């Protein structure tokens, strides 16, 4: 009889699962707050937070309570009927973020697809673009999901190699290049929207220059082009504000949320906008069997309550400043790390090596051995994003682990 240890579970996945991920060799079995435990019982600090889906911490009791109570009452109705949770959730989320309407979905990619459809429909029915000619501007090195349409406007070879033919109708500009965006908008007659991540997460936590977002927003307004913010990873307090756009006072025409909208407890995403834009959608024109289900709504309400009640935006802002300051001290002691960048508790360190090297991966393995889990986003970048419930004492312990690992690795 085989022992059910780490290797057993890794072998099981390798044998029966598609090989479309390259996980760190750790098998997680339990999570609570900022901690996760592997099947052997070793405890780790989680510095990925499921790509910012568990901002509220693992197994938050309030969110668990909402899930278990609602699951025993009513989980799914489809949208063929009204349910007693959806309206309450819609009222709450539109109130928090300042929009008229929300369209509920499940995954982040679904929400991006939904936003694209809404923007195109608005462009034909309100702006008056000739049918089937609307364009959406996107940024190079973007990550908005993995559906066929979304990878159509990715320039990551892993995302789109051998998946064609691709969906047309997208124009690319370099990220953080306001001049390139302005040039594309010189003739805005067939442009429906500009879709942007306020901080590019998968690209390596690339923070644009201050003023880029507000200038881009103003250009869109001037040219009657919708400004769509994909805050699936940056939203829900991760960057020290409820939205990363809030740092520049930008209120998007269309807002995309996901991940931490449920505290990592259930797939919940949302597209928010105003009446003029959302009202182009009519019954039967878009939907989802699971979107807006009673269970999802109960969980999302609880998850949003936790963010507000525990002041997670404020904690992310404070802890993020401490983190970057301390990492900069480590940088002065080593030539392995060249920079730290980020906002709030969405951060990354840049490794002094090439993007195709294994150094970032090897360093993550060493961090794992020392009790902290993180993942490279490229060969020379490591994203560091703990749950937003982390305390200052815990953060300092994590910084000590990172420092020890880097200095030992550098020998």
Predicted regions and their residues:
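Conserved N-terminal phosphate-binding loop of PLP-dependent enzymes in the Aspartate aminotransferase
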Residues: 2-411
